[in-house]
């Protein structure tokens, strides 16, 4: 049989088939099956800061005390992060191939916090999925490209695992 071993972002892969972030990669059981079926690496379903905040906002009630809203927001954040970190740990236990976490954040502090926790949970690498809309008011030529570079630099200063940047079609 032909040897398909390769490397990607410093990771040794048995073949170049990398399962992308999707609903197919949102459970350790599914990831185990993908590994058994021959995948070379798996990118976990992305963790979106925006979805966490949206869920928290949906539970806010103007009749609540502000402290209650803050508590709910923090609880939901911690719960969602815990679920994601558990997915990493459980996938690592059952998969003999690299597990790549994926995050999408919109606040600078969360890029760093999420990256640290993901590395500590045992992910082999981190995909950063940056969405930048050029319809934003503060857009100037090159500003989104610079934002990508800045986020990457901050994350690379913080963690040791490989970082992969997912680029959208809105960059020049």
Please describe what each predicted stretch is.
Residues 2-172:
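Active-site entrance/lid segments in N-terminal catalytic domains of soluble metabolic enzymes
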